Amino acid sequence: MSKPNVLTQILDAVTETNTKVDSVQTQLNGLEESFQLLDGLPAQLTDLNTKISEIQSILTGDIVPDLPDSLKPKLKTQAFELDSDARRGKRSSK
């Protein structure tokens, strides 16, 4: 049996190294895609923290929140209906 030529050994080592580099590059590309999904996470966490702090303040009575505009007209309408019913001497069924 003859020994493998030095150039053949070098070629085999380079081929094996190239295969390993390709595998690592594929893994890195996958990680890069995963990190891109996390780009907006700090802003989302900050927003969530702010909302949680506001909720905690409301629950402890530190602040009283303003009602959303979508609820204000309904409350005015309901108050008007209750007032009208009271003037007519009717009991509210609400």
Swiss-Prot record:
Record's keyword terms, sorted: Host cytoplasm, Host nucleus, Late protein, Viral occlusion body
InterPro entries documented for this protein: NPV_P10
GO cellular-component term (any): host cell nucleus
Role of this protein: Plays a role in the proper virion occlusion of the polyhedra. Forms extensive fibrillar structures in both host nucleus and cytoplasm. Involved in the liberation of polyhedra from infected insect cells.
Coiled coil: none
Native species: Autographa californica nuclear polyhedrosis virus (AcMNPV)
Position of the signal peptide: none
Subcellular location(s) per record: Host cytoplasm; Host nucleus
Protein name (Swiss-Prot/TrEMBL): Protein p10
A Pfam entry, by short name: NPV_P10
